[in-house]
Amino acid sequence: MKSGGIRNYFLQYFIFIISAAASITMVAEDNVEYFKYGDFNSWITRQIPESRILGGKIKTLYEVGPTQTIEGAKAYKNLDGSPWATSNVYAKVVGISKGSCAVVPDTRSAGNKCAKLTTIMERCKAIGIINVDVVVAGSMFLGEMIEPVSSTDNPYSKMDMGIPFTKRPKALCFDYKLEIPVDGKHIYSSGFGKKKILPGQESAEVMVFLQRRWEDSSGRLYAKRVGTGRIRFDKSTKGWVNKYQLPIMYGDITKKTEYKPYMGLIPSERSYHARNSKGKIVPVEEVGWDNETATPTHIIVMVSAASGDAYTGTLGLTLRIDNVGTVY
């Protein structure tokens, strides 16, 4: 090969290497916008005195927000613009105060925390008055929990699900670590009636829905689904999975190969709830799929140590989550 040919060959090779490196850099430099407090390094500690009839102990609950301690049986409202709510609740039923905690901060490394979500059996016992066991799956979502909770009826009616959001991300990103107990049973226990062993294996779940919502003159809320991402994890991980991306598909996704039945529209009988313009918590009825170019008004993100109906789960199933954001 002549010297000129050699130079051209190496020049082309050099350009190829630079181009490949540039393409790799572009992938690595996805624009990620993290939700406020989405690194889970800052937590609020709540000290709830439970009723004497239940033993009168102090129950510790945690919320995601500015570091501080709140003492007393007080209804919690999100602080400092934190968009995060959890399944941790202060309940007051027929005058009896009780706390439940299935989401806690956990140390991931020195100076670095994450959220730890576990499915637990919450027991409430007062001799001669009450004796109930309730399966509680540790869950987190964008929105607000309405406290104090006064019953186990329709748990979604106690949750203001979703926050205003008008962007169109291509994915939800997060770090996660999952531990599923070997031979763990899938249990239903609502506190009423007998416990049941359900068929199948439980899994953890992460979902992101983009909705375009509107309100009618009577205060009813409706929505069309703009974007969908939903996944169920049914295998324990070998340590942390970092920078996982859950793709968001736009428009009607029912004909896509990636579609699974659990990604469908929310049935009206299981509608999530939100606060309308009158300040009332009402169902948000999903009435159809929106145009794939539509602009959303709200985003729903939920992370859970279970994927089934309320009051079901596998005790001990533990999902750790960290660094939650949207990818563009």
PLM feature segments, named:
Residues I15, S19, T45, K177-E179, ...:
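Residue-level marker of positions within ordered structural domains that often coincide
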Residues R168-L178:
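A short beta-strand element within beta-rich, extracytoplasmic domains
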Residues L178-K185, K196-Q201, A310:
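Extended, low-complexity, turn-rich repeat/linker tracts enriched in Gly/Pro/Ser/Thr and Asp/Glu
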Residues P181-Y188, S217-G219:
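Short, solvent-exposed secondary-structure capping/transition elements
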Residues M161-T166, Y188-K194:
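A contiguous catalytic/ligand-binding core that recognizes phosphate-bearing ligands
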Residues E29-P169, P199-D252, K260-A306, Y311-V327:
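Aromatic (Trp/Tyr/Phe) and Gly/Pro-enriched flexible surface segments
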Residues M1-Y34:
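Bacterial Sec-dependent N-terminal signal peptides
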